[in-house]
């Protein structure tokens, strides 16, 4: 069966109800989350502030190129399956099968990580010590233990309820949740700069003091390389803006605006944020270690700022950001499972939508996996494991977005249809090769620290995604006997016509 997902009449499929502003903030909601607020803390502890800045800057270039490459294809062909569909159209249906299932699994794990993060965040109020929250919890009173259990359950329940709303209402809620996050990051940057200049508890100028003592780098070149997996986790979700293409109003105009808006602002906010964190906190700050996440580095800086209640307000925003990011992961995973069902790669029942155009069975199935992670007794270690898996999964996806982009352009050229590009990727052809090179190198090198000494759990978290993707690919390749799609035969028509009809409607 064909790997594509055609746009069906509105009553039978997803509804086009998302405006440009909602898509922009939905993208922010998926990107700005626990990866930035919590993930950079463990990266700072393991690698140092300079390594953190290098990894976010270098990988930021790759992410920017990825968003433009994907945006070019999404505007041309706005479908719910996004790059997973494009891989099937322009490369190989077996690869589409493999990547879509893997990316769906990635979104279920991402949802679990955001849900689990809420438990880590509330530890700021529940655990007064600076030690490991897991150890400290042994002496916590029953009501505090109850809060630690109820919080992630409530977060997951809220994610499910919000994803059952009509997509227009869901987009509006995400718009405001994401607006809060963007405002908070901007406020953090301003307060962090003031804190560095001397507006802090010690009333002293900090500057780059911590880049000298304890230092700018930790663990040398290994620290630099390993920091890229944390950066990849923080940038996870940048590619999922294209998943809104199937529900965007007038995608030919709304998607380019949303992609430009998101790409530039995310990179700017991220790089400045990691710099501000790196100049205000030494890498040996207690509680930043990935195995015992004490609190967000953002909360540390606000606490250092000295304003009463500022740290608690920051922590509350981080809690809401985990809810927002969970919403986005569930939204993305739901649309992928819907896409799989439409293409015949999953049971057809998952393509069933209610009267509001919500694939409600896909919502329930995607959220089910997150429940397993709620039973973990060591939230910090489990969250760190999930972080690595999600990061690697996204790097694999970015590589094949680039491959699809190259094949897409070749198909347009061979068939004489390059004039149809509404949103040309100005980084082509250099951009896709940058994506493949950078992510390909770090995909294999960043897990080096798991080898010396060898740590099985850490090794699995870095490399389990590779055999999963390869195995799924070979299973479908052998079963369906698929072949590489010829550039002269690649389908450039089906959803391009739907795009014209949609925008003229």
From Swiss-Prot:
The keyword Cell membrane does not apply. The keyword Nucleus does not apply. Signal peptide: none annotated. InterPro entries: AA-permease/SLC12A_dom, Amino_acid_permease_CS, APC_YAT. It is found in: Membrane. GO terms for biological process: amino acid transmembrane transport. Keywords: Amino-acid transport, Membrane, Transmembrane, Transmembrane helix, Transport. GO terms for cellular component: membrane. It comes from the Eukaryota. It is a multi-pass membrane protein. It holds the Pfam family AA_permease. The chain crosses the membrane at residues 25-45, 50-70, 149-169, 175-195, 221-241, 266-286, 305-325, 357-377, 383-403, 425-445, 456-476. Belongs to the amino acid-polyamine-organocation (APC) superfamily. This is Probable amino-acid permease PB1C11.02.
């Amino acid at each position: 069966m064909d790997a594509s997902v055609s746009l069906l009449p509105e009553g039978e499929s997803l509804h086009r109800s998302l405006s440009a502003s909602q898509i922009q903030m939905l993208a922010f909601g998926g990107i700005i989350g626990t990866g930035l607020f919590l993930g950079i803390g463990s990266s700072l502890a393991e690698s140092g502030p300079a390594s953190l800045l290098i990894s976010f800057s270098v990988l930021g270039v790759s992410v920017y190129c990825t968003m433009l490459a994907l945006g070019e294809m999404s505007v041309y062909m706005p479908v719910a399956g996004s790059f997973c569909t494009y891989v099937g159209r322009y490369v190989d249906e077996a690869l589409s099968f493999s990547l879509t299932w893997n990316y769906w699994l990635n979104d279920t794990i991402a949802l679990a990580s955001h849900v689990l993060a809420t438990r880590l965040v509330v530890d700021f109020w529940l655990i007064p010590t600076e030690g490991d929250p897991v150890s400290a919890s042994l002496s916590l009173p029953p009501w505090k233990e109850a809060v630690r259990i109820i919080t992630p359950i409530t977060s997951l329940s809220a994610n499910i309820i919000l994803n059952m709303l009509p997509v227009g209402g869901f987009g509006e809620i995400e718009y405001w949740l994401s607006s809060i996050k963007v405002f908070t990051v901007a406020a953090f940057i301003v307060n962090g700069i003031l804190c560095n200049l001397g507006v802090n508890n010690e009333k002293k100028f900090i500057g780059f003091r911590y880049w000298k003592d304890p230092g700018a780098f930790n663990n040398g070149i290994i620290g630099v390389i390993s920091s890229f997996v944390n950066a990849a986790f923080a940038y996870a979700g940048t590619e999922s803006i294209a998943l809104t293409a199937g529900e965007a109003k007038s995608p030919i105009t709304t998607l380019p605006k949303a992609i430009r808006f998101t790409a530039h602002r995310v990179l700017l906010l991220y790089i400045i944020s990691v710099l501000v964190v790196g100049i205000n906190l030494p890498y040996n700050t207690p509680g930043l270690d990935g195995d015992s996440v004490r609190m967000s580095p953002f909360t540390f800086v606000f606490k250092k700022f000295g304003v009463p209640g500022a740290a608690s307000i920051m922590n509350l925003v981080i809690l809401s950001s985990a809810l927002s990011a969970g919403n986005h992961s569930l939204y993305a995973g739901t649309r992928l499972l819907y896409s799989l069902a439409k293409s015949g790669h999953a049971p057809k029942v998952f393509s069933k939508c209610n009267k509001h155009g919500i694939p409600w069975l896909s919502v329930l199935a995607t959220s089910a996996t997150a429940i397993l992670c709620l039973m973990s007794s060591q939230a910090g270690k489990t969250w760190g494991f999930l972080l690595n898996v999600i990061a690697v999964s996204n790097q694999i996806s970015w590589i094949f977005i680039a491959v699809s982009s190259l094949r897409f352009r070749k198909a347009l050229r061979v068939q004489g249809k390059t004039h149809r590009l509404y949103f040309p990727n100005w980084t082509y052809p250099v951009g896709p090769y940058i994506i493949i090179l950078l992510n390909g190198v770090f995909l294999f090198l960043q897990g080096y620290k798991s080898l010396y000494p060898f740590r099985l759990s850490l090794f699995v978290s870095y490399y389990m995604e590779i055999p999963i993707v390869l195995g799924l690919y070979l299973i479908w390749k052998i079963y369906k006997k698929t072949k590489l799609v010829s550039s002269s035969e690649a389908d450039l028509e089906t959803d391009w016509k739907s795009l014209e009809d949609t925008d003229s409607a």
